[in-house]
Amino acid sequence: MVISYAIPVCNEHVELEKLLLFLVKHIDKNDEIVIQCDQGNTTPEVYRVLDSFKAPVGLKDPLKIIEFPLKGHFSNFKNNLKEHCIGDWIFQIDADELPNESLITNLKELLKLNPTVEMFLVPRVNTVSGLTQEHINKWRWNINEKGWINWPDYQTRIIQNSQKIKWQNRVHEQIVGISTKGALPLSEEWCLYHPKTIEKQEIQNNFYDSL
């Protein structure tokens, strides 16, 4: 079994470096990491991070790097990323997210035990540093005792690599073509971590409002 870890990126160079260091260390050698840059908008800092992972001459690079313009159409962007993945499964991870180590370690065994499931939802731990009660009220967020926002915030991220499965909608994209789906356990050990600052959260909200 081969898993393609598919990562869209634009300007998240600090978070991307952490994610790539983690994946290179923990995934199987036959798996692949596919990075898709937002063509024309990806920052020089991101390219410097990607360059730092290049293998010496004669050795295989650990990353497959492609370019495609986002142009505000998230489904087209992710569908193009999917087309460059060769794995049996695709795990789409945003550049500013980080999987729990247990999720990566145990993922293949879970997939083997559920061969008829075509998509898995992944719980996500959202945290925002600098968050105030005013922000919470404004965005109507639910915060638990650990400071996690809208837990479990399940994300549709792990899919079989099938031609019938794709994303649709320009914004707030959804996966279609799924016959059977499941959810990873409601536990931190199976989660994605998604930390942000309040400044980045407000920039993101304003960006989505402009689309």
Tell where the protein language model's regions lie, with residue ranges.
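A general structural motif
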Residues: 2, 28-30, 117
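A conserved hydrophobic helix/loop-capping motif in glycosyltransferases and polysaccharide synthases
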Residues: 3-12, 19, 26, 36
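Amphipathic, non-transmembrane alpha-helical secondary structure
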Residues: 17-24, 83
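Short amphipathic alpha-helical segments
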Residues: 18-20, 47-48, 103-105, 133
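Acidic donor-binding segment of Leloir-type glycosyltransferases
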Residues: 21-67
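Short, acidic/glycine-rich phosphate-metal binding loop used to engage nucleotide
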Residues: 66-74
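Catalytic-site signature of metal-activated, phosphate-bearing donor transferases
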Residues: 74-82, 98-211
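Short beta-strand-to-loop acidic/aromatic patch adjacent to the donor-nucleotide binding site
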Residues: 87-98
